[in-house]
Amino acid sequence: SFYLIPNYTAVENVALTLELNNFKNPEKEAKLLLDRFGLSHRFNNLPSQLSGGEQQRVAIARAIAMKPELILADEPTGNLDSENSSMIADILFNFAKEEGSSLIIVTHDSKLANRAKRKIKIKDGKID
Protein backbone atom coordinates (compact mmCIF):
# COMPACT_ATOMS: atom_id res chain seq x y z
CA SER A 1 0.00 0.00 0.00
CA PHE A 2 1.21 3.47 -0.85
CA TYR A 3 -1.34 5.26 1.34
CA LEU A 4 -3.03 6.95 -1.57
CA ILE A 5 -6.51 8.28 -0.82
CA PRO A 6 -8.80 5.75 -2.54
CA ASN A 7 -11.50 8.18 -3.69
CA TYR A 8 -9.04 10.82 -4.99
CA THR A 9 -7.61 10.76 -8.51
CA ALA A 10 -3.86 10.66 -9.09
CA VAL A 11 -3.83 14.45 -9.54
CA GLU A 12 -5.92 15.01 -6.41
CA ASN A 13 -3.64 12.75 -4.34
CA VAL A 14 -0.59 14.83 -5.28
CA ALA A 15 -2.38 18.21 -5.25
CA LEU A 16 -3.76 17.70 -1.74
CA THR A 17 -0.30 18.06 -0.19
CA LEU A 18 0.24 21.25 -2.17
CA GLU A 19 -3.21 22.64 -1.29
CA LEU A 20 -2.62 22.05 2.41
CA ASN A 21 0.59 24.06 2.12
CA ASN A 22 -1.02 26.97 0.26
CA PHE A 23 0.57 26.49 -3.16
CA LYS A 24 -0.99 28.83 -5.72
CA ASN A 25 -1.74 26.28 -8.45
CA PRO A 26 -1.72 22.86 -6.77
CA GLU A 27 -3.47 21.04 -9.62
CA LYS A 28 -1.10 22.47 -12.23
CA GLU A 29 1.95 21.57 -10.11
CA ALA A 30 0.58 18.07 -9.49
CA LYS A 31 0.08 17.54 -13.23
CA LEU A 32 3.62 18.72 -13.99
CA LEU A 33 5.03 16.28 -11.44
CA LEU A 34 2.92 13.36 -12.60
CA ASP A 35 3.92 14.09 -16.18
CA ARG A 36 7.59 13.79 -15.13
CA PHE A 37 6.71 10.34 -13.82
CA GLY A 38 5.12 9.31 -17.12
CA LEU A 39 1.59 9.42 -15.74
CA SER A 40 -0.10 12.13 -17.81
CA HIS A 41 -2.52 9.53 -19.18
CA ARG A 42 -3.55 8.63 -15.61
CA PHE A 43 -4.33 12.09 -14.17
CA ASN A 44 -8.01 11.29 -13.57
CA ASN A 45 -7.68 7.66 -12.50
CA LEU A 46 -8.38 6.49 -8.96
CA PRO A 47 -5.73 4.37 -7.20
CA SER A 48 -7.81 1.23 -7.79
CA GLN A 49 -7.53 1.89 -11.53
CA LEU A 50 -3.72 2.11 -11.41
CA SER A 51 -1.19 -0.71 -11.48
CA GLY A 52 1.04 -1.19 -8.43
CA GLY A 53 3.91 0.53 -10.23
CA GLU A 54 1.71 3.47 -11.19
CA GLN A 55 0.50 3.79 -7.60
CA GLN A 56 4.11 3.79 -6.46
CA ARG A 57 5.00 6.58 -8.90
CA VAL A 58 2.02 8.68 -7.71
CA ALA A 59 3.16 8.19 -4.10
CA ILE A 60 6.73 9.24 -4.94
CA ALA A 61 5.45 12.31 -6.82
CA ARG A 62 3.36 13.22 -3.78
CA ALA A 63 6.36 12.73 -1.48
CA ILE A 64 8.61 15.11 -3.41
CA ALA A 65 5.91 17.67 -4.26
CA MET A 66 6.84 19.81 -1.24
CA LYS A 67 10.55 19.75 -2.15
CA PRO A 68 11.69 18.23 1.14
CA GLU A 69 15.24 18.67 2.43
CA LEU A 70 15.43 14.94 3.17
CA ILE A 71 13.97 12.12 1.10
CA LEU A 72 13.78 8.66 2.68
CA ALA A 73 13.04 6.04 0.04
CA ASP A 74 12.50 2.41 1.04
CA GLU A 75 12.75 0.24 -2.09
CA PRO A 76 11.53 3.06 -4.38
CA THR A 77 11.84 0.85 -7.46
CA GLY A 78 10.61 -2.37 -5.85
CA ASN A 79 7.38 -2.75 -7.86
CA LEU A 80 8.66 -1.35 -11.13
CA ASP A 81 9.96 -2.79 -14.38
CA SER A 82 13.52 -1.91 -15.42
CA GLU A 83 12.49 1.04 -17.62
CA ASN A 84 10.38 2.67 -14.90
CA SER A 85 12.99 1.82 -12.25
CA SER A 86 15.57 3.75 -14.24
CA MET A 87 13.19 6.68 -14.68
CA ILE A 88 12.37 6.83 -10.95
CA ALA A 89 16.05 6.63 -10.01
CA ASP A 90 16.84 9.44 -12.45
CA ILE A 91 14.04 11.59 -11.05
CA LEU A 92 15.05 11.00 -7.42
CA PHE A 93 18.76 11.63 -7.96
CA ASN A 94 18.16 14.65 -10.22
CA PHE A 95 15.60 16.08 -7.81
CA ALA A 96 18.00 15.72 -4.87
CA LYS A 97 20.77 17.41 -6.85
CA GLU A 98 18.58 20.23 -8.21
CA GLU A 99 16.87 20.98 -4.89
CA GLY A 100 19.88 20.37 -2.64
CA SER A 101 17.98 17.60 -0.85
CA SER A 102 19.58 14.66 0.90
CA LEU A 103 18.48 11.29 -0.43
CA ILE A 104 18.62 8.09 1.61
CA ILE A 105 17.62 4.94 -0.25
CA VAL A 106 17.18 1.47 1.19
CA THR A 107 17.42 -1.09 -1.59
CA HIS A 108 18.42 -4.60 -2.58
CA ASP A 109 19.02 -3.37 -6.14
CA SER A 110 22.79 -3.14 -6.62
CA LYS A 111 22.40 -1.08 -9.81
CA LEU A 112 20.43 1.54 -7.88
CA ALA A 113 22.81 1.40 -4.91
CA ASN A 114 25.81 1.96 -7.17
CA ARG A 115 24.41 5.34 -8.21
CA ALA A 116 24.79 6.67 -4.68
CA LYS A 117 27.76 8.80 -3.63
CA ARG A 118 28.04 6.83 -0.42
CA LYS A 119 26.92 3.28 0.31
CA ILE A 120 26.43 1.55 3.64
CA LYS A 121 25.93 -2.20 3.50
CA ILE A 122 24.15 -4.13 6.20
CA LYS A 123 24.79 -7.85 6.41
CA ASP A 124 23.23 -10.11 9.03
CA GLY A 125 21.98 -7.05 10.93
CA LYS A 126 25.40 -5.39 11.14
CA ILE A 127 27.03 -2.60 9.19
CA ASP A 128 29.49 -4.29 6.87
Predicted regions and their residues:
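ABC family nucleotide-binding domain
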Residues: 1-115, 119-121
